[in-house]
Swiss-Prot record:
Modified residues (Glycine amide): 9
Sample GO molecular function, one term: metal ion binding
Tissue: Expressed by the venom duct.
Residue numbers of 4-carboxyglutamate PTMs: 8
Domain notes: The cysteine framework is C-C.
Origin organism lineage: Eukaryota, Metazoa, Spiralia, Lophotrochozoa, Mollusca
Record function comment: Targets vasopressin-oxytocin related receptors. Binds calcium.
Protein name: Gamma-conopressin vil
Disulfide bonding pattern of the chain: 1-6
Family, as annotated: Belongs to the vasopressin/oxytocin family.
Subcellular location: Secreted
CC terms in the record's Gene Ontology section: extracellular region
Keywords from the named record: Amidation, Calcium, Disulfide bond, G-protein coupled receptor impairing toxin, Gamma-carboxyglutamic acid, Metal-binding, Secreted, Toxin
């Protein structure tokens, strides 16, 4: 992702 935490990265 960009800043926030994403399930992928």
């Amino acid at each position: 992702c960009l800043i926030q935490d994403c399930p992928e990265g």
